């Protein structure tokens, strides 16, 4: 895109802050608490992902924790907010929140797989972006688990580089 990720982040920050303003104006403390908690979780997930950047031997549990804190938390909050606005009982709120979390996990796992196995025209964005950014996702975790020692060394070296090359991605 012309403006890159930075404008998307700024727009997202603006929308989040606007949501907080609206919740304060509305006086809905349940939603305000949920949104503030969710933004904290997303930030924790970003930090955790940065801590593990370039680790080809990332454990699956750590990957799941990262996507729980990021994508799943966002989907979970969206469904919970909808249930709060609809004045549903707590059992239904909890069920929708759980649904949102699981939908977020499924979405992120599928998105991560498509980053390696889709075509750019179909996927709608650059293929291999996670690889080039040094983000280890489930396809790499599974590949690393099934790899022999030579393949593991290749993956480890590829992810330790400051910049990964197209040749590394294609190999």
Where are these regions (language model features)?
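All-alpha prenyltransferase/terpene-synthase fold signal
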Residues: 1-171
């Amino acid at each position: 895109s012309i403006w890159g990720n930075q404008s998307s982040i700024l727009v997202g920050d603006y929308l989040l802050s606007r949501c907080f303003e609206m919740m304060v104006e509305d006086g809905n403390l349940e939603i305000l608490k949920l949104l503030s908690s969710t933004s904290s979780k997303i930030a924790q997930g970003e930090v955790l992902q940065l801590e593990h950047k370039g680790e080809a031997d990332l454990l699956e549990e750590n990957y799941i924790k990262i996507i729980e804190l990021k994508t799943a938390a966002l989907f979970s909050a969206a469904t919970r907010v909808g249930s709060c606005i609809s004045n549903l009982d707590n059992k239904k709120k909890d069920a929708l929140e759980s649904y949102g979390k699981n939908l977020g996990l499924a979405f992120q796992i599928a998105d991560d797989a498509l980053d390696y196995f889709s075509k750019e025209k179909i996927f709608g964005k650059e293929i291999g972006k996670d690889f080039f950014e040094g983000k280890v996702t489930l396809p790499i975790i599974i590949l690393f688990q099934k790899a022999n020692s030579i393949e593991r060394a290749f993956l480890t070296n590829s992810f330790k580089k400051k910049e990964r090359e197209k040749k590394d991605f294609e190999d």
